[in-house]
Regions:
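General structural signal for secondary-structure boundaries
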Residues: 1, 33, 55-64, 203-204, ...
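Short conserved aromatic/hydrophobic patches within beta-strands of well-structured domains
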Residues: 47-48
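A short, solvent-exposed beta-edge/loop patch
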Residues: 3-17, 23, 27-28, 121-229
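A generic structural signal for short, non-catalytic loop/turn and secondary-structure boundary residues
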Residues: 40-44, 81, 147-148, 187-189
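Short, solvent-exposed recognition patches
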Residues: 52-183
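Alpha-helical transmembrane signal-anchor/signal-peptide segments
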Residues: 25-44
Length: 229
């Protein structure tokens, strides 16, 4: 038994050293996304009040968030009409900027809950479609604070594929190997984190002009559903 443990640990160490050597010698691929998120997302919709916000509540907090997440572009824009409010948050990382797990560390399950929100519902890898086009599977949750309940769909897109946050019993020591299995050896692909939140349910929102334009714009982020390999 002891010998088996030693062999297993040795294999893991060799794998880690090999990966570090690979990532040091092989440069990350060139980014394919060249547009500014603020230009890409709708900013003028008849009958809707649209506003851009800092990535957090204050410039200081926004600076800290930016330093922590190290994104290359980001946008936080809200759309309001009567009693309907939609929040759109998108962050972008060029290849090699951040690890997949680090970039995905600001999901509502972490940031929102840490800041006082209660998670009432959660679903993983949820089918999501618009205008007969399928998106990569989404993450879904319902979060509430001070009687303000928000329905949230979010995606962490890695090289065009959704990164799932479904919990498993696999120890964290194998997390890098799981990423390689799912995304290939080059773990330095373009990443987007997209979050859509609203005080209304999404079946209602899909009939609105704002949601229609938002979802149409998101196709440019390579979020179409990919064939399972």
């Amino acid at each position: 038994m002891k010998q088996l443990v030693i062999i297993t640990v040795s294999i893991l160490l060799v794998s880690v050293i090999g990966l570090r050597t690979y990532f040091t010698l092989v440069p990350p691929p060139e980014p394919t996304f060249q547009e500014a998120l603020s230009d890409l997302m709708p900013d003028d919709i008849k009958g809707w009040r649209i506003k851009d916000h800092d990535m957090a509540d204050s410039p200081e907090a926004s600076s800290r968030v930016s330093d922590f997440l190290k994104f290359d572009d980001a946008i936080f824009r809200t759309y309001e009409q009567y009693d309907t409010a939609i929040g759109l948050y998108i962050a972008y990382w060029k290849p090699g900027t951040a690890s997949y797990r680090w970039a995905g560390a600001h999901t509502p399950d972490t940031c929102w809950v840490v800041n006082g929100w209660t998670r009432n519902e959660r679903a993983y890898s949820v089918p999501f479609s618009h205008a007969e086009r399928e998106f990569e599977p989404a993450e879904f949750g319902v979060y509430e604070m001070n009687s303000n309940e928000q329905n949230v769909y979010f995606w962490h897109i890695v090289g065009g594929r959704a990164y799932s946050y479904k919990q498993t019993k696999v120890p964290n020591i194998f997390s890098a190997l799981i990423d390689i299995k799912n995304f290939g050896l080059n773990l330095r692909k373009e990443q987007f984190f997209v979050r859509i939140s609203s005080n209304k349910d999404f079946e209602t929102l899909k009939s609105t002009e704002a949601m229609d334009q938002i979802l149409e714009a998101l196709y440019a982020l390579n979020m179409d559903k990919k064939e399972v390999l």
